[in-house]
């Protein structure tokens, strides 16, 4: 006779084992109809699952995040149902939940087209209208194999092979279609009405490019139509802001098939890149960092010592010369230790902060590449701080403050922080981990910012802090990291002479603020929709003449602004002034300076903004002062 304790503390007793759905019905018909699943003693279960003993129960509905994820997972199964009806020879692979949606990987003899995706979506809607129950059957392993063998689902059989210890598995039946899953899933298709398929792409079995290619169908699903409509609106806005489209339109960069994952920077884009690099160089110099430069190609032996060859070789570009193996560096850390190791250091020289705008290359799968956001060749604003254990907290606190200041300069004030602590498998004593975690937590507390604790999510060699930016669309981008490392200095024999004249290994703080220049520029493009603040804009002002008579004065203005350190250019083409204004407005130039006969006579410029505001006529010196103030505010004018 189980007694069920509900979240409000109330209890309900039953004469026999009772399902989650039955408990919901005992509370009310409305709740029963809204029940997606249950959480029994903290564990998610299906609505049909029986509770045989006393337990706590939370009814999960579409309003709960867990309920929304279950809806998305069940929508993936619905994709399978529709695909098998439309394309009977297709073989289903996996269909997990992802951020804001789901996907299903499918093996089929040809690539799916947009017409196929529309047909699949239409069939899914027809299946939902049938309002059928989703039936769960916990099935013995041998019978599961029989089911998928009879259906020629080769990939499902491979997945069963991957779980040799599982003697029974959950099979979920959508009418004639069956899928395998740990669950839980929705009890009925009525919960799946607010969905949309979003895109198609290729994928590889087990994510390995050496394996066969699959079709991936992406979709999104929400609790109701209103949420779905809001999401679609966000996606449409995001598509308008796609950095690939804006980058092409503004002439910033391009990518091409002959160099997958590599960026061709155009003059305007490289100017933007240089602004970022010069800004970060100044910031780091002012905060005690020493800039270095290390080799691109390094012998295999160093990567073996660091552990990268054993754990990361598949992601490294390698080459051979004179019977020696080399790798193009995927990260800068081992090389920075080599710089530290040149000459024995004293504790008086610590902390030592070594920074590099380090060009790295990683052999990312081609299917994962995305514009300049996910590339194979990139540059990090990388630095490593070598310090004593006693200096960990102060260095961490200083880095947190520096990082938040940098983000504010770029217009980002909504920052999410996560602290990841010790995993089960780790190096270093518990006492050292206690001190390291305490140092990071205290540094975060001193910044006065809330953070999410992620127990067990740290690296085996130390805890870490992650910094994520929220952009104008509410999207979260993980950029900065602060990673404590007790392991690499030992592996690569980094030492210093301590106060008692003994040799000790320093603690190594891996840190980056932007992450990679390429990805951060992509984020900036989408956040500002290409309309960068004046300090970042590749061209800050364009001087336009109305007729040829004003050309000489326009060139004088350009020269004056350039000598004052501004990025200005003249447009002296024989075009109507309205045409020129429109063109440079579309190119997102912050300030448009128009010169006619009156401006030449008065030695002024008529100033307009790209938003269309008329700032009136002013002397060139006054405009230069105005522009200097706009530049000095950096990205803070809209955030403070």
Curated annotation (Swiss-Prot):
Residue ranges of domain TGS in the record: 1-61
Residue numbers binding Zn(2+): 333, 384, 510
One GO BP annotation of this record: threonyl-tRNA aminoacylation
Molecular-function GO terms, alphabetical: ATP binding; metal ion binding; threonine-tRNA ligase activity; tRNA binding
GO cellular component: cytosol
Keywords, ordered alphabetically: Aminoacyl-tRNA synthetase, ATP-binding, Cytoplasm, Ligase, Metal-binding, Nucleotide-binding, Protein biosynthesis, RNA-binding, tRNA-binding, Zinc
NCBIfam families assigned to the protein according to its UniProt record, in alphabetical order: thrS
Protein name: Threonine--tRNA ligase
Annotated source species: Pseudomonas syringae pv. syringae (strain B728a)
Gene name linked to the record: thrS
